[in-house]
Amino acid sequence: MILEIRLSNFFSIKDEVVLDMQAASIQTKKAKELEENTFVCGDERLLKTVAIYGANASGKSSVIKAIRACVGMIFSSHNYNENTIFAFTPFKFGGIGKPSTFLIRFLLEGIEYEYSFELNKVEILKEALYYYPNGRRSLVFSRDETKGPDKKNIYEFRSVIRRPMDVAANTSKKTLFVSRASQMDRDTAKDVFRYFNERFILNYFGYNSFSVERLLNENKEQFLNVLRIADSDIVKIDSRHENKVFSTAVIDPADNQILSVEDIQKPQLVITTYHRNNPDVPFNFFAEESDGTQRLFNMMLTILDIVKNNKILLIDEIETQLHIKLVEYIIGLFNKSESAQLIYTTHNTYLLNTNKLRKDQIYFVNKRDDGSSDLYSLFDYKDFRDGLDAEKAYLQGRFDAIPYIDEQTDNFIK
């Protein structure tokens, strides 16, 4: 689970910003009432959800995009070649040519890890992994490409990873050592890689048909509840697999000519829905339900899987195409989960409610005079007491992070 993320020189982020998922020590009645929004992992109490507010073009999305870019590199950098250009943009007003940095602290099997790397658009410059097996910081490996070209000077290892120099010899400046070491079956690196690959959900995604059927059957009542919140009149939903006959051509590889056409059977998922007004009339879900209902279905598959399996979801503009009550329900699912974590951006001030979110769960992004983004928490405002109206204070500009609107519209209208 995430303890902390630090970023610098990504997109509109210039100076280092910190997203802290460790619950602050808030000794108030309201914080105690919202204790279910936190969970204990090891010796740490962590937040389940964090909301990021800010004006348009303030840089809210930059936080999500930067995390996605860095985690995506961990997933796939072992496949990069010498022509790869990394999928991010440094801060354009002074950040071009300077390194970008990413650091994450997380808990894996109750042990704290600290992983970081530094890079520019075309190569990895530094990388390091530490862990705390007995509560004390211990090096797994460090890498500094400025000390090259000799790999023995670039890398420093402890005795955690098996034959590490074999991995280093196969790690180019385009590749993260963790990615390569995992690919080469090194245990500690595999554990770290698996953490990012299995725990971090960077966006909504698809499932195979058997997983869809399983998730639907396991969560049918919750699906129907979500549909009710979305003002759907669906009252029943069933699923099954049917064998469908498909025709397939047999091709002669020698001349690419069709030799024959064969019928084959494949299992196909069939989802049937029933509506309030005519509960005996079946509807083919994929053919007859609306695009919006199908999008909601796919999204909720992801969310229910994440919540049940204690994964981590990043969402930019969580309210997009969703009713605000449904968004509130989704956030509530995470806050009621065992240890799932949700990081999301939003414009909707209806959700800015300190009766439902702790002060350390609310972050703001504000654009500085130089165009860069600053990230800070409502918890930083020590004079903001429980019981005050956070939405009203935000709209009045008390926390900045709102757009400047010139109310003199006469010239614009003319």
Positions of PLM-derived features:
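Conserved P-loop NTP-binding catalytic core
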Residues: 35-51, 55, 64-124
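Electropositive, glycine-dotted interaction segments
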Residues: 114-246
